[in-house]
Structure formats: C-alpha cells, structure tokens
Amino acid sequence: MSEKTEQPTEKKLRDGRKEGQVVKSIEITSLFQLIALYLYFHFFTEKMILILIESITFTLQLVNKPFSYALTQLSHALIESLTSALLFLGAGVIVATVGSVFLQVGVVIASKAIGFKSEHINPVSNFKQIFSLHSVVELCKSSLKVIMLSLIFAFFFYYYASTFRALPYCGLACGVLVVSSLIKWLWVGVMVFYIVVGILDYSFQYYKIRKDLKMSKDDVKQEHKDLEGDPQMKTRRREMQSEIQSGSLAQSVKQSVAVVRNPTHIAVCLGYHPTDMPIPRVLEKGSDAQANYIVNIAERNCIPVVENVELARSLFFEVERGDKIPETLFEPVAALLRMVMKIDYAHSTETP
C-alpha cells in the first residue's frame, strides 16, 4: 500500500467536508459562549437585581395571605420573572454557539457523517481510538485546562485576600462591589485563557484533518484519471485542442513570465508587468498532456519553469484563466517572481 505523503487536493478536501471532516475547535465555541455570558451579565445585572428585589418585596406582601393563594401568585410571578431574565440569556448562548461554528466551518451538510457506521460499535476500533493521538491530546488538554484554571482562580483569590479580610468592616454595598469585581476579573482571566487554548486547539485540529486527508501518489493519479473521464473535462480537452490548433495557447505561454508546475500533472502560466499587469494573472493552465505541452513551449522559449507543488495546485484549482491571483496567494507568487527576476538579472549580467 502506497504511503500517504501528498497533501490533499481540493476535491479531497471537499469530499472530507461532506463526511464531516472539518477544522473545528470546541474550545473556540466555549470561548464564544463565555463572551456571551459575560456580555449578558454586564448589561443585564441591574435588571436582574431589580427582579430579585421585586420578587422579595412581592413575597413579603403575601405573608398574611392564604397559603394556596400565595403559592399560586408567587409561582406565577417567579415564572414570569425567570422567563424574561433567561430568555435573552438562552438566545445569546445559542447565537454564540451557532455563530462560532459557522465562523469556523461555514455551512456544511455532512450527510455521510450522520449515517450509521459499523466501526462505531466495533470494540477493536473503539479500543484503538482510546489510545489514539487525538485521545492523548484531548487528555493532555483537559488536564492542562484543570491546572491552568485552578491557577487562575488561586491567583485572583490570593490577590483579593487582603480585601476579603476587610469585608466585615466594609458594609453590604461595599461587599457586593468587591465580589462583583472579583467575579468580573475571574471571568476575564478565563476568557483570555480560552483564547490561547482555542488558538492552539484549532491549529492542532487543522494539522490533524490535513494529516488524515493526505493522499498517496496513486490516489492523486487516480483522482486525475477520474477527472479526465468527466464530460466537462472531455469538453475542456476538445477546447484545448482547438486552442493548440489556433495557436492561442502557445501565445499565452510565450507571454508569461514564469510557469509553475507540480512535477507531472499541472502547469500554470503566470503573467506580470509592473505597469500593464501590476497584479499577476493566470494566463493559461493545464493538466497532464496539456501541462507537458505548456512546459515544452516554455522551455523552447526560455521561460522559467519553477516546480512548486503547493502553489501550482492552488493556482490551478482556485484561479480561472485570465483572472488575477487572489490576495491569499500574493506572498508565494511574489516570492516566485522575485526569484525569477533574480535569475533573469544574473543571466543578463553574465551575457557579454
């Protein structure tokens, strides 16, 4: 069985999304929920205190009333108060949860992930999962969270220790301010901690998903064969043959400043000019036989051919012919163009 050393293609990533293999961190979701709770208590604390005072006052007014009547009235009042108080809280937490998931993975309909899988009840498979890398990382992460949260709580209680000793001489209003200040800073400390944990966990999940979706060289070749059998690809091949016959493809290659390729399957022609084309464009691209044809034309016309697997794939799958490169590819394309220009300059200085 071939070793899986190749990075996943765009098609592989799309198929992974359909199966629920997306980069998602539960810690980031927890962070959004903590922020929602913090904002709720920050803006609605006074309202909650007023509701509490009204409830206590209403209870005292019912002291001399018959028990059944008082119980009914008090129950109705509590239900009404709790409903109004918790409605915004529940809505805020739900919005924060859904929003965090949407920001991480977008809209994903993973129908394959919902279906029944026999390995879920396979004891051997489940035993392996217990000792998998993911399980070890989750155990370490949980232990780290317990330790760090304990240290955060210990630090703030130690910091407020002298203030607590003065509370008996402070009065009720002062005590409420001290406790509310402690709770606020504890909450902020926990949120900062979850920001750090969320970034680390998201990075690990990204690494794990990419690792799980890696492909062997045979997988990549098979995927290209499958694409070649697609009707759209056949139509594109006929268009490519027409372009070759008309000379438009060769003309596009000759106008490019560099050709980026992955070793055998993909070739992309980049066009750039400081004034006429300040943002690089994909002038032409091709796969398999067309890629070899592009490389041959480039080599015959002394156009630099650079092998860069990641960049070639990104340009091929993300940018259409004639389109400008997206901002996400500015840096690698700029680095490639700088290298090509240095080579051209070195050749020009060496030529007598």
UniProtKB/Swiss-Prot annotation:
UniProt-listed GO biological process terms? protein secretion
Q: Which UniProt keywords apply?
A: Cell membrane, Membrane, Protein transport, Transmembrane, Transmembrane helix, Transport
Compartment annotation: Cell membrane
Q: Which residues cross the membrane?
A: 34-54, 89-109, 144-164, 176-196
Q: How does it sit in the membrane?
A: Multi-pass membrane protein
This protein's source sits in the domain of life called: Bacteria
For this protein, the record's SUPFAM superfamilies field holds: EscU C-terminal domain-like
Q: Name one Pfam family in it.
A: Bac_export_2
Q: Look up the record and report any one GO term of the cellular component aspect.
A: plasma membrane
Summarizing the function annotation, the protein's role is: Part of a type III secretion system.
Task: Give the family per the record.
Answer: Belongs to the type III secretion exporter family.
Q: What protein name applies here? A: Secretion system apparatus protein SsaU
Write down the species: Salmonella typhimurium (strain LT2 / SGSC1412 / ATCC 700720)
